Amino acid sequence: MKTAFYKNSLINLEQTNREDFQKLYEDGKKGLLSCSVCREQVRLYLGIHNHPTFYHHLKRNSTCEDPFIQPSSNSDHDKDEYLERDGFRLPKSRTIIAAETTPSYKTAQALKILQPFNEQKATSIEETNGYMKQLQSAGVHFDENQARAVISTEGPLLILAGAGSGKTRVLTARTAYMLVEQRIAPNRLMLVTFTAKAAAEMKKRLTSYPGIDLRQINSIVSGTFHSIFYKILLYHDRERWSGENLLKKDWQREQIVKEAGRKLGLDDKEFAYDLALQQIGLWKNTLQFPGQVRAESAWEEKVALLYRDYEKVKETNGLFDFDDMLIGCHQLFKEKPHLLEKYQNRFDYFLIDEFQDINKVQYELIKMLSLRTKNVCAVGDDDQSIYAFRGSDPTYLLDFAKDFSGTKMVILNQNYRSPHEIVETANAIISANQQRHKKEMRAQYTLSVQPKIFYPYDEEEEATMIVTDIQEKIEAGAKPEDFAILFRTNTASRAVFERLTASSLPFKMDQDIESFYDRFIVRGILSFFRLSLNEDDSDAIKHILPALFLKQSVFRDLQAESILQDCSMLEALSHVKTGFAFQEQKLKKLVKIVRSLTTTPPLLAIERVEKELGFQDFIKKRGNEGNKLEKGSDDIRDLKVAARPFSSIVELIEHANHMSAMNREIKALGKKMNNAIILSTIHRSKGLEYQNVYLLGAVDGSIPHDFALDSYRNGDMQPLEEERRLLYVAVTRAMEKLYLSVPQNRRGRKANPSRFLSKLKKEPLVES
């Protein structure tokens, strides 16, 4: 049905503002919609596969049909009155029907698969003798390229292992082959993984192979770069590298740089120390030490000073961080060549997993250790190199043969994870990259189900459509663990998190995803709202001080003034003496404006904080604090989208408080939950697989990110190529079905489909 009664008026979806579908959806859940025929309660359906429609949720098999009448669109109630501001339509009075409507619903489309499925299944090699025969008898089979990779053990070997190509099987089987067939002593092998979890998984896999016992496995020097090289440091100087001296926690390192920042006059609540530590880590991993750093911005100049002091404090107190484990070993080998020679003679073979994610210090260590034998097996996929912010560089994989002459290369190009439709979509996306080894993955089967692109109106409707689709699939027999919702940055998950918390669906997310409402900029604006509701909210006062260009030390002055003047903390701001007449005058005006926010609609209240209270100026002067991915102005736009459904700041604050509490609760529950929908950044999803994958925000500005687009305009292609690799990683997580969301609007502005999808022609949706 396209018609329903809403607030005693008959409405028609075809004459309804497109942006109001989400409000109708929410109001339908509140019982505010009724059937235009029988007057029973109805709801609005918003899903991926079918057009929006009103339906009876309390009774099945309804026979009601739309009446042959047109709703009135010229009554005072049905007329929209809006203020247009910065891409957001701010309602003077909230209504639904308009004479001129925003663009209508856009039907989901199936991606046209550029190459047809060619059923040439990878041939399983039949072995007649030796250890490969034993593996085959144990149910461990290989295609031709996999078998070549397993038995090629001498000299440098580069294994390009595409997504879903059986990389772990090849790496573990190669290790077992060397131990059993070639009788290589396990302690002559170094097996390097990028996570402790991956190392444990490989050991577990090895125990299932014939001829391998636990003693052999435990004799292999295996683990992450950090764990292996830290053991070397401990062996040679246990006192210097004692675990008691390790800065294990982020807060310990942050404490040191914050102390250094105070000496430079940096505000604890204003300066992004977490990003500063990330930048310091990047410099260290690329072997750029204090005094050698070339700062590329004013922010980096500050961080370079923090870096200098951070290293001095550590040196003075005999402390070290995780990055120092690799740098320390690198320096040890440089300063003591006899020790380097000892370890060169200690190891004959090196197997390095996820080689595309290697950084400079890791690469240099492997080159140093393998100088004698050159028996380095590097396994990776340049198309999945996505950690440039940590110092990782696919160039080390691409140029491997230059440093290791005589390199053999094996390409594992059979994808055993995903159907042809998903594999071919991934091929079409990644083929546009220039900096890569030319290769094309092949699927082993087809499901004749094309990946879908769907077009929600905005982020709110995007979340609703996805949750509706998941609910439908679970009702049809799917399990929650069959679903993953992926996103480029944490902020993009806000709406879908809120929609899932309102559902009965179990879900879990990365532990480091903070609540959107706890983000620095968002919390700053909301603190003005909180202060208008409670003028003695000390926490809110502390959070608005940076935006008023006041140091945290002013808080004590406010407490004193509040007592002396017998006034609220808010009023005390008008008594603060800063020594600047202009600033003091501004603080006096602030009290009246903040108090007026209690009766101001949320969208207008945000604008008043931005413009009348100087928050916009604060963001401009603050810059993006070294964070190339998340700008303060973007947070404000996201907050405006989130605030749109609320009629008062009281409602918005209550919602924000609830969502912050739910964020903590979901993370706590998630630690013990297995059968749950996964919310994850694309970065965190790497190496994992799911039956159904939904990708949020496949639009320019999201993926590729604005930062990459800006870099491209300035002549730097690398960030854009990494963004394309990110999309490739997201697509190849799907084992069965893939849904790409292309919102028509993002952050209150018209959005354009991701340029990475431009090659993929579309065709009408085939239901599935």
Where do the protein language model's features map onto the residues?
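A basic/glycine-biased coupling hinge at the interface between accessory DNA-binding modules
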Residues: 128-129, 178-329, 374
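Helicase P-loop NTPase motor core
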Residues: 168-171, 406-408, 414-506, 533
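ATPase/helicase motor core of nucleic-acid motors
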Residues: 447-448, 478-602
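Accessory/regulatory regions of helicases
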Residues: 85, 89-124, 134-136, 702-768
